[in-house]
From Swiss-Prot:
Cellular component aspect of the GO annotation: plasma membrane
Keywords: Cell membrane, Membrane, Transmembrane, Transmembrane helix
The organism's place on the tree of life at top rank: Bacteria
Subcellular location, principal: membrane
Bilayer-spanning residue ranges: 2-22, 168-188
UniProt KW DNA-binding keyword: no
Cystine pairings recorded for this chain: none
The protein, known as: Uncharacterized protein Mb2261
Organism: Mycobacterium bovis (strain ATCC BAA-935 / AF2122/97)
Amino acid sequence: MLLPAANVIMQLAVPGVGYGVLESPVDSGNVYKHPFKRARTTGTYLAVATIGTESDRALIRGAVDVAHRQVRSTASSPVSYNAFDPKLQLWVAACLYRYFVDQHEFLYGPLEDATADAVYQDAKRLGTTLQVPEGMWPPDRVAFDEYWKRSLDGLQIDAPVREHLRGVASVAFLPWPLRAVAGPFNLFATTGFLAPEFRAMMQLEWSQAQQRRFEWLLSVLRLADRLIPHRAWIFVYQLYLWDMRFRARHGRRIV
């Protein structure tokens, strides 16, 4: 939950996404009610978008669309939103792209240009798997950086969304013993992974002493990453694909 929680904060910093999640009537996607199911759904989507086939993407799109049809603002909502809005989906996809890039950059620094360009072009599927038209995805990394900077001006985390996200960062949805042990550490790590502008919106303080501890944490994660074979990460995504295909064949819900 370390880097993923930080990325969720980034996604929900757009008010339409934040309130869409907060007010969603789809209980099966509520992290506080079904945390492990929520994690499985997210993992499945990332696996399908990155290594899945066109058939896999059609399956996940159909399943997600069923849930998204119920997620739209009402007369009492603080902001107007619709889960099918490609602009909102583009922002979420952009954050997911940053999730993959951040994993590398926090541990090893920037990717080489050729690799970064290839990763970026593949990342468009994070949006086009749903309702983001291919032409809406910024054509290159320079255009993406411009889109990102423009988008920062429209970000805002209101108090209700902030409370929800702080609970996500401190794993408030876990049973008490796990929550008590993992919560403070996960909140610390999540704060470290956030850029300063997101920390400010979350009203999270960060000191030089905390940064030094965070750098130590990164060194531990760097060592762990070097010890775990790359194939192990691919295998985890493959498991998500196998699980989704099994569920589809047997008429069980995918998300």
